């Protein structure tokens, strides 16, 4: 059997936005009512995405990490889900600063991420409009989803699958760039040698 591709995904957002519930809904198709929001967990999950077996390592961050922990998680991850709660404007306002930290830690690479507005079942308490989420996603140059980990509303599976696809696309582009770059170096070295020989 062919070896599966491995992808490291990390979930970030303020404590209480439903990061753990989102991950558990994706993995088990169930909603958990009680859990410790201060716990950090890592899950391994295998899925077939576009006819290819992919092993996801998913880091569910606690949302209360200190700076050193958070930066370590950001270095570890290849793809990121930035989650906010549509009923909590403060959690939405924390997304852009999080993205800026990610950019700083990951540079010069572009960050692969998806923006998620969770708790879409609580539309009556909404503080962040869908349009605001879409506008921020455009600024961040990423896909945007609204969903509910509680009811399963929105395509939660697609969030994780699309992030895996995007990570794998970026890997392929970076691999081609590296190959082109090394080919250029070889050509330059040969040209230098030929110049020396002919002079």
From Swiss-Prot:
Alphabetized SUPFAM superfamilies for the sequence: P-loop containing nucleoside triphosphate hydrolases (SSF52540)
Localization terms from the record: Cytoplasm
Transmembrane segments: none
Amino-acid positions noted as binding GTP in the UniProt annotation, renumbered to this chain: 13-20, 60-64, 118-121
Pfam families reported for this sequence: Ras
Keyword field contains GTP-binding: yes
Keywords in alphabetical order: Cytoplasm, GTP-binding, Hydrolase, Nucleotide-binding, Proto-oncogene
Catalytic activity: GTP + H2O = GDP + phosphate + H(+)
Hydrolase is among the record's keywords: yes
InterPro entries in alphabetical order: P-loop_NTPase, Ras-related_GTPase, Small_GTP-bd, Small_GTPase
GO CC entries: cytosol; fibrillar center; nucleoplasm; plasma membrane
GO MF annotations in UniProt: G protein activity; GDP binding; GTP binding; GTPase activity
Enzyme Commission number(s): 3.6.5.2
GO-annotated biological processes: negative regulation of cell growth; negative regulation of cell population proliferation; response to hormone
Family: Belongs to the small GTPase superfamily. Ras family.
General function of this protein: Binds GDP/GTP and possesses intrinsic GTPase activity. Has higher affinity for GDP than for GTP.
Name of the protein in its database record: Ras-related and estrogen-regulated growth inhibitor
Organism: Bos taurus (Bovine)
């Amino acid at each position: 059997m062919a070896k599966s591709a491995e992808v490291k995904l990390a979930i970030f957002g303020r404590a209480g936005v439903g990061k753990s519930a989102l991950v558990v809904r994706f993995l088990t198709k169930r909603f958990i009512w009680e859990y410790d929001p201060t716990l950090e967990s890592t899950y391994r999950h295998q899925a077939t995405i576009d006819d290819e077996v992919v092993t996801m390592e998913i880091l569910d961050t606690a949302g209360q990490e200190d700076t050193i922990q958070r930066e370590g998680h950001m270095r570890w991850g290849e793809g990121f889900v930035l989650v906010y709660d549509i009923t909590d404007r403060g959690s939405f306002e924390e997304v852009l600063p999080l993205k800026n930290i990610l950019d700083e830690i990951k540079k010069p690479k572009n960050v692969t991420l998806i923006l998620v507005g969770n708790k879409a079942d609580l539309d009556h308490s909404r503080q962040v409009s869908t349009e605001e989420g879409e506008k921020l996603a455009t600024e961040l140059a990423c896909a945007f989803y609204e969903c509910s980990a509680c009811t399963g509303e929105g395509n939660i599976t697609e969030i994780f699958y699309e992030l895996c696809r995007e990570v794998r696309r970026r890997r392929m582009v970076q691999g081609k760039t590296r190959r082109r770059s090394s080919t250029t170096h070889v050509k330059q070295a040969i040209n230098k040698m030929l110049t020396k020989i002919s002079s």
